[in-house]
């Protein structure tokens, strides 16, 4: 996430296609090398290379998509792009575990790397980098430095609230994903194989459907009122909260799975609309860097604090609640959706005015 910022800084100045190809190549090669690591240091260095390659693909991809589609049509393609996360998780849960069980973790790394190398070749011949600002009908200016982009975001009321709200949503999501396997094993005495199959269906398929539909409905409703891009996230987050609480407190595994289906499906819905509004509010010449800043904050706080918070709360609750400590900790984390909704609602309240200030039509 950290190295995504300098890579995005470069992507706003050179060919985004080349940045994506180089990053994907690095990701795939270093993933393959992970399978040959002989000690912890070698595996750590290879894994760092994987992270650098991963960090360099998303921001320029988001910026290119924003330049290909009109402002009121961006949420859908950005959501479709995000489906890679759900598909990857589905494959990891179903295929990765099987390969690891039968052939070992080294082979699993090598198998995972091969599709990326194939995509590098495909991208070299088919990927096109559109002119910056094409979909906005304006020519991009000279790319600004990092400080100017950071100040632009900080001084924009909508972007401030959007980043805070989306970060809280991500914190809830990362915490849940990290602890759901332990929750099902510890609370419902399920096997790891059973948990893998359930999460593959819930997150891989259910989450993927929710992500795609979120982008679609955000674009459809947003054509009536652009604020629906954010209202949609707020409404579904609030509707999904009781389902999450009920699932974590359920004493029956089947009931917990059924209740989780809805919040997991809409949990990643924020992705398309959030990125669509980000790229509508920033200038074309700063899109890659703005996207990298958003992802950096989302990941550092969401991934850094989300799972940790549940673990700390579970330890704290264990004295008084014993085996129910983890469910109560996950319920507490889920309540952050209320806080997130406040910031996203505030972002919606200033969205139209801030879009008009950019010279576009809200």
Predicted regions span which residues?
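Helix-breaking motifs and short loop linkers at transmembrane-helix boundaries and internal kinks
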Residues: 15, 36-42, 53, 70, ...
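Cytoplasmic helix-loop-helix junction between adjacent transmembrane helices
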Residues: 46-86
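Extracytoplasmic gate region of multi-pass secondary transporters
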Residues: 157-212, 267-271, 275, 303-310
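Juxtamembrane intracellular "pre-TM" segments in multi-pass secondary transporters
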Residues: 131-163, 187
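C-terminal ends and interior cores of transmembrane alpha-helices
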Residues: 25-38, 237-251
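Helix-loop-helix hairpin linking two adjacent transmembrane segments in secondary transporters
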Residues: 81-129
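Symmetry-related core transmembrane helices of the 12-TM Major Facilitator Superfamily/SLC fold
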Residues: 107-125, 327-346
């Amino acid at each position: 996430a950290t190295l995504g910022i300098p890579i995005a800084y470069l992507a706003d100045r050179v060919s985004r296609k080349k940045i994506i190809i180089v990053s994907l190549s690095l990701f795939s090669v270093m993933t393959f090398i992970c399978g040959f690591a002989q000690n912890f240091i070698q595996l750590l260095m290879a894994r760092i290379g994987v992270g650098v390659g991963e960090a360099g693909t998303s921001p320029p991809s988001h910026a290119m998509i924003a330049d290909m589609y009109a402002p009121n049509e961006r949420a859908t393609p950005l959501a479709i792009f995000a489906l890679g996360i759900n598909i990857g998780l589905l494959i990891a849960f179903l295929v990765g575990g099987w390969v690891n069980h039968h052939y070992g973790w080294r082979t699993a790394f090598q198998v995972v790397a091969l599709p990326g190398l194939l995509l590098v070749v495909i991208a070299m011949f088919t990927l096109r980098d559109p002119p910056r600002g094409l979909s906005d009908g304006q020519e991009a200016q000279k790319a600004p430095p990092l400080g100017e982009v950071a100040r632009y975001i900080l001084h924009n009321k909508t972007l401030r609230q959007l980043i805070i709200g989306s970060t809280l949503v991500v914190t809830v999501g990362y915490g849940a994903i990290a602890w759901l396997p332990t929750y099902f094993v510890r609370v419902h005495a399920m096997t790891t194989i059973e948990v893998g199959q359930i999460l593959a269906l819930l997150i891989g398929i259910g989450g993927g459907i929710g992500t795609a539909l979120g982008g679609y409905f955000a674009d459809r409703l947003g054509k009536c009122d652009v604020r629906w891009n954010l209202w949609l996230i707020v409404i579904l987050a609030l509707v999904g909260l009781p389902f999450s609480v009920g699932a974590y407190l359920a004493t029956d595994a089947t009931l917990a799975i059924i209740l989780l289906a809805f919040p997991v499906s809409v949990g990643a819905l924020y992705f398309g609309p959030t990125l669509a509004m980000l790229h509508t509010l920033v200038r074309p010449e700063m899109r890659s860097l703005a996207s990298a800043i958003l992802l950096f904050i989302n990941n550092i706080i969401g991934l850094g604090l989300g799972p940790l918070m549940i673990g700390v709360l579970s330890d704290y609750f264990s004295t008084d609640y014993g085996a129910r400590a983890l469910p109560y900790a996950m319920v507490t984390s889920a309540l952050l959706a209320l806080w997130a909704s406040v910031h996203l609602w505030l972002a919606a309240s200033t969205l139209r005015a801030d879009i008009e200030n950019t010279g576009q039509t809200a």
